[in-house]
A protein has these predicted regions:
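Exported/periplasmic ABC-transporter solute-binding proteins
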Residues: 27-73, 81, 86, 93, ...
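C-terminal motif of bacterial Sec signal peptides marking the signal peptidase cleavage site
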Residues: 22-26
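Central helical "cap/lid" subdomain
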Residues: 116-126
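Short linear segments in intrinsically disordered or otherwise low-structure-confidence regions
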Residues: 18-20
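Bacterial N-terminal signal peptides that target proteins for export
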Residues: 2-13
Length: 282
């Protein structure tokens, strides 16, 4: 009986040891699999979202493409959203998860910082380009205009419609309104219902480019993007309207957001702006 008992104990012991070994192997395999998943996620490039003013819809994708190529990133690693600066700011205020905000003015980024002064924001606004204002028509020759003849054209009684971006939301619209006010024609045009207000500079250009209106105060970059003929636009002197200095701000701690911003401000990034009809920041 003693021998039988010992054999039974030995069998039970072997069975228990085998079960423990199998359990340990299973746990080890499970932990290894988890580690592989964690490492895979960690090695994936982070993705960022950029909220950009509508006037950047032509040049910014070019800059992103060049940056992605230089850094071997996929197209989807940087997501772009275009709208009026004011609309984007409202989205950010409401909690939209953007990593970088590129405004068409300096006001909104500065406002974002001032509203968080007590929390001491880690980043400060940076000026990334200066926009230019252009008087454009898809149907009428305006290339030979100058300051005097443009003022005369605007003041002359006419049924011609002129579009500007919403001055309250779009910096290009605010500068266009200021220009019209210095020429003493804004109130008259508004009263005559000849001013057609667009939501943003992108829509203003659409109105002018499709012939829905006769003229439009648009971004020089938009005119450059479509390769407009010299007869189709007149670039306003930069001293004739409030400077359109465009500021941005990094909103998150994402390393990719900081690195892309550095590229935006680099000579390579600034060359894209210059080629697109902006004034590069030196």
């Amino acid at each position: 009986m003693a021998l039988k008992f010992n054999k039974l104990n030995l069998i039970a012991l072997i069975a228990t040891s085998t079960s423990i070994a199998l359990a340990q192997a299973s746990c080890s395999a499970e932990n290894t699999a988890k580690e592989e998943v964690v490492n895979e996620v960690a090695n994936q490039p982070e993705k960022i979202r950029i909220a950009a003013a509508a006037n950047l819809s032509d040049v910014l994708p070019q800059i992103v493409e060049a940056y992605n190529t230089e850094n071997s990133l996929a197209e989807q690693d940087i997501e772009l959203t275009f709208a009026s600066s004011g609309k984007l700011y409202a989205q950010i205020q409401a909690g939209a998860p953007y990593d970088i905000y590129l405004s068409a003015n300096q006001e909104f980024p500065a406002k974002w910082v001032s509203e968080r002064a007590e929390n001491m924001p880690k980043t400060q606004p940076f000026t990334y380009t200066q926009g230019q204002l252009s008087f454009y028509s898809a149907t009428k020759a305006v290339g030979n205009l100058n300051q005097t003849t443009l003022a005369e054209l605007l003041a002359k009684p006419s049924d011609a419609k002129i579009t500007i971006a919403n001055p309250d939301l779009a910096p290009y619209g605010a500068s266009a309104k200021a220009y019209l006010q210095t020429q003493n024609v804004y109130d008259a045009l508004d009263k005559q219902k000849r001013l057609i207000q667009a939501e943003n500079i992108g829509q203003a250009f659409q109105y002018a480019n499709t012939g829905s209106v006769d003229y439009g105060f648009v971004a020089q970059s938009q005119v450059t993007a479509i390769k407009a003929t010299p007869e189709q636009f007149y670039t306003l002197p930069v001293e004739s309207y409030p400077a359109i200095l465009q500021d941005g701000i990094v909103l998150s701690d994402a390393a990719l957001a900081t690195d892309f911003t550095n590229y935006l401000l680099s000579p390579a990034g600034q060359q894209y702006f210059a080629d697109a009809g902006y004034l590069a920041i030196k």
